[in-house]
Design a protein with these regions (language model features):
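Amphipathic, oligomerization/interface secondary-structure segments
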Residues: 1-138
């Protein structure tokens, strides 16, 4: 169940990025030292994390590391890439909560909800433990 929620949330954010943030994701790809031919899920998640970083209180380097871990976890499950390490339950759970919060940020921003009201969401379950979740994504 947790894995399905993780995969569905990844897909939602990847689709949003493809439709509405493709240029921003391309800029992340260009700055990636391990450039690929195209924009990958890692670049899309990293772009969204960078956009959300003021609210999340994370650095640019953390955005890259988190995006890499999340992308590897998604690839493990969707491509049955057994060369990768199976993500832990804690990593999947924490990644799911982080991605779900980013999805809320996207939706609330599109609805015109002010940033200070969005920041209030972090005080409520399950988002009050966002710092803990970020630390569990490894």
């Amino acid at each position: 169940l947790k894995t399905n929620r993780f995969l569905n949330t990844c897909q939602c954010l990847e689709t949003y990025s493809c439709c509405y943030r493709n240029e921003e994701a391309k800029k992340v790809r260009v700055s990636d030292p391990n450039k690929t031919k195209g924009v990958t899920l890692k670049h899309r998640i990293e772009d969204l994390l960078i956009e959300a970083s003021p609210c999340l209180g994370i650095t640019r380097d953390q955005c890259s590391t988190l995006a890499d871990t999340i992308s590897n976890a998604r690839n493990y499950y969707t491509h049955y890439d057994k060369k990768r390490t199976k993500p832990t339950f804690e990593c999947i759970s924490a990644s799911t909560e982080l991605l779900h919060f980013i999805l809320l940020l996207v939706v609330y921003s599109l609805l015109g909800i002010p940033e200070n009201a969005i920041n209030e969401c972090k005080k409520y379950t399950p988002y009050k433990n966002m710092t803990y979740y970020i630390g569990e994504i490894k």
